[in-house]
Every structure is written in structure tokens, then in C-alpha cells.
Amino acid sequence: MHRTSGQSQHTSEMQPLLELVDLETVFPTRRGLVRAVAGVSLRLQGGEILGIVGESGCGKSVTLLSILRLISSPGQIRGGQIIFQRRDLLALSARQMRQVRGKDIAMVFQDPLSTLNPAFPVGEQIRESLYIHGISSPGPHASPQPRGWALRRARPASEKERVLRLMSEVGISSPMDRYREYPHQFSGGMQQRALIAIALACEPKVLLADEPTTSLDVTIQAQIMDLLRRINRQHGTAIVLVTHNLDLAAEFCQRIVVMYAGRFVEMGTVEQVIESPRHPYTRGLLACIPRISAERRRIQPISGAVPDLAAVPPGCAFAPRCANARPACQTES
């Protein structure tokens, strides 16, 4: 992996809030073993905003799902470590992991309409996230609580007030009225705000945002990103943003990781990655971005196609598409 030089010594010396060490997630298929995440490592500091950028199918979303141990069978996390506050999450029991998931590390999923339950009011779905982690008493639509959990229940009135404040904080207008409404009665932007409210309900230290603006128009995209930025500033919540939009990552994030074929190929501050990209793939992504300027410039698409993750070529996975590939690229990653 190409790493940009000159990163802050202070950042490297700080104890990271979240660290991935040689994380590998695989999926057995008829074509062979797909290494969706192929031994990646990164460090996330408290309060930091980190972007993971790459083409569709490169492993960005699987990386986030791996952090929360939400990989469905037959997929499995085959190796590495996921260290959160000095604990390896892969060593936790399923019960211990449930206490981390949604409370300490929460996730905003890509498609709000398929994530929200169409049968329950939005306000009750936000309240349920409090109930699952023992902060609230069960509402009328709550799921059964796992056995052996001790609830720290607040009064029902204060619970609803907390949900209403949260709905207001994420920009859901008239929260008292919207509390009883169902997901189909919300616009796409409001559905995404509801997902963010669910993720923030237990005041997590890390928020994983998987393409949070994909299905939204440009104006609503800007509002959602402004909301996430405000959450980061007001609450100190660390954010990992997954996106295919390099411009968006450059505007929103402090550091950027570029991912290709299950691997991190470049990592650095926004200035390092955007101003002085070292990996040919990063340079190719930047050349694909249309610019509004007086200078007329032809967009240069990256030739070829993303490799089959069940048959990634040896060496640098980008070599078959790279105009500057050398013989060493066929053997060295």
C-alpha cells in the first residue's frame, strides 16, 4: 500500500479509538473464495472523520459490516483484529458484542427505506434502540429483550422526550406529529435523518456511515452532510464515511483511505491524497472527476474493469488497468 508521508507524529502516538489490524473477510462462492476485505489496517482517533473511497464492489461496505461483526453466513471474518478501546471485538461473545453494537459503535446504512421497519412508527423505532441497550422501558412495538440483561429504565415520559429531542436535533420537523408516522410517510431525506437518529440514540463514540447520501438529491445530500459534521463537532463522535465520491470525502473528511479490490492502496490527509496522490489508482479517480473551470479538459476514464475478487491477479491488483505498470507490479502489491 502506498502511504503518504509526513503524517502528524502526534496522531501516530495517540492511542486510537478504533484500530483494524490485517482484517480479512471472505465469502466462499462457486467461482472460488472471494476476499472482499484482504488484510486491511487503519487507525481511527476519537473525534476524527475518516473517509473510505473506492468503486462499487471494492469492499468498503463489507469493511464496515466487519467492524460490527454483521457478516452473514457463509461469509466470515477469517483473520486480523478489530480493536476498540483496547478490546479486540473479534474475541467478544455474541452477547458482549450486542452491547457494543449500536451503543458504542453505530451505523447509518445505505438505503433507509429497506432499513426502517415499515410496520412500526418511526418514533418507536428510535425508542427501541434505547430499549435494546437498557436505557428505556419497552414500548408497545419493542422486540423481546435478550435474557439476562439488566435494564436501566428511564420514566416513559422522559423516554419520549428524549426521542423527540433527538428527532428535532437531526432536523425532523414537528417531531411530536412525526413520532407516530410510518417510514413511508417520510421523504427520502427524512428517512435518512430517522436512521441517523436511531444511530445516535445511545450516543455512540463511533458512527459508521455507509453511503448516507446515495439516493438523495444534491440539496438534501448537503443537508445530511452538514448534519453529520455538526454531530461530529458538538458530540465529538468519530465518523467513518464510506463513499464513491472523492470530492465529497475531500470536503467532509480529515483523512482519506482509497480502497481497491479489497485492499487499502493509499492513505493520508485530505491534502496529501488530493494534492499529491502516490498510487496510480488514486490519480485515475481524480482524473475522472469533472471540473467547472475556464480550462477545457477531457475527462480521462480508467480503462479496463474491476477484477473479479475471486481471482485477483498476483502483485498489484490495479496493474492490469495501469498505464504505468512495470514488471515489479506483477509480483509486488
Per-range role (PLM):
Residues E55, R69, L208, P212, ...:
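P-loop NTP-binding/switch modules centered on Walker-like glycine-rich loops
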Residues D88, A142-L151, R155-D177, R230, ...:
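Conserved ABC ATPase "signature" region
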Residues Q15-P16, S173-D177, T269-S333:
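Short catalytic/signature loops enriched in Gly
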Residues A201-K205:
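A short, proline-enriched helix->beta-strand linker immediately N-terminal to the Walker B motif
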